[in-house]
Design a protein with these regions (language model features):
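N-terminal hydrophobic or amphipathic helices/low-complexity stretches enriched
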Residues: 32-51
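Alpha/propeptide regions of enzymes that mature by internal proteolysis
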Residues: 43-46, 55-66, 71-77, 81-84, ...
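Flexible, acidic active-site loops/lids enriched in D/E/S/T/G that coordinate Mg2+ and/or position polar
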Residues: 68-149, 155
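Short acidic loop-to-helix transition motifs that present clustered carboxylates
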Residues: 94-97, 216, 235-242
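Short glycine/serine/threonine-rich phosphate/pyrophosphate-binding segments
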Residues: 123-132, 136-140, 218-219, 239-243, ...
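Acidic beta-strand-loop-alpha-helix segment within the catalytic core
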Residues: 142, 146-233
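Glycine-rich phosphate-binding loop
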Residues: 237-238, 247-279
Length: 280
């Protein structure tokens, strides 16, 4: 993308790239030799980058299924060349009526001696955004090697939707030191905002909360407005939104509300890389 800006964030082999309005996130963890890790790391990166670039051809063309199909096809094509034994544990499914990359699908060459990976992915989170030519779509992969003696490193979430709360590193660290703080998905969002405001050194009215614009999140929207905090509502793009509190390029302090369950796993992996926290 000649007109796209590229942002690299490295943290123990984790890489986030922004290409124009399509983001590519790679979350990767292993105990392999550094050289081997580096090669496979870049192959995962190329898979997500390829998906983002192919789906971007459908920006603003009103066909979200075509954008998703292009991304799936691009990722699968890259997986076919990767010397790994991969299995998709979180992928496309019934909820999306997606064209491929389903849970349980085997990816990679599965050559003898190649590393075993559990793979969680979303070829495009925010296909509606792509179809409308809007920002905040993301193509991402989280991959992990199971520990010795363990059957899996990532697990399927047996739900379509989850309640989520995401926050920046300073809030996460404070909650770790004092678990009694009302920083919880079970606490009223008004209390979470008040505590977060103190930790961030802000007035309650200056705290920005991002929420997915859905009727199921109306109770959160009402609390944020009643408290007088800033509210930023989004139509789609659950993964990007949940990671926003940990990205210095945004002014989002908290993300709250009910969104996709598979997306919760991917955004949690991203938050771990970025230092923030997420509950779901």
């Amino acid at each position: 993308a000649s007109d796209g800006k590229i942002l690299f964030i490295w943290a123990s082999g984790n890489l986030l790239i922004l290409i124009g309005d399509i983001e590519v996130l790679l979350v990767y963890g292993s105990l392999m030799h550094k050289d081997e890790e580096r090669v496979i790391e870049l192959e995962f990166l190329r898979a997500t980058e390829n998906a983002a670039l192919h789906s971007s051809h459908w920006m603003g063309r009103g066909d979200k299924e075509a954008a998703d199909y292009a991304a799936c096809d691009a990722i699968r094509g890259m997986f076919d060349l990767m010397d790994i034994r991969g299995e998709i544990v979180i992928g496309e499914g019934i909820k999306d009526e997606a064209p491929g990359l389903f849970i349980g699908e085997k990816v990679g060459t599965w050559a003898e001696g190649s590393p075993r990976f559990d793979v969680a992915l979303d070829p495009v989170d925010g296909t509606t955004n792509v179809s409308k030519g809007m920002p905040n779509s993301i193509s991402c992969i989280a991959a992990a090697i199971p520990e010795e003696g363990e059957d899996c490193a990532l697990q399927e979430i047996p739900a379509f939707y989850m309640n989520k709360l995401a926050y920046p590193e300073v809030v996460r660290q404070a909650w770790i030191k004092d678990p009694s703080l009302p920083i919880s998905i079970d606490a009223p969002i008004s209390e979470v905002i008040k505590v977060s405001a103190k930790l961030l050194g802000k007035n309650v009215r200056d705290v920005t909360v991002m929420v997915l614009d859905r009727p199921r999140n109306e109770f959160i929207i009402e609390q944020v407005r009643s408290l007088g905090s800033k509210l930023r509502m989004i139509a789609d793009g659950d993964i990007t939104a949940a990671m926003a509190p940990s990205l210095s390029s945004t002014d989002v302090d908290l993300y709250a509300g009910i969104g996709g369950a598979p997306e919760a796993v991917l955004s949690a992996a991203g938050q771990r890389c970025l230092g923030g926290g997420q509950q779901a």
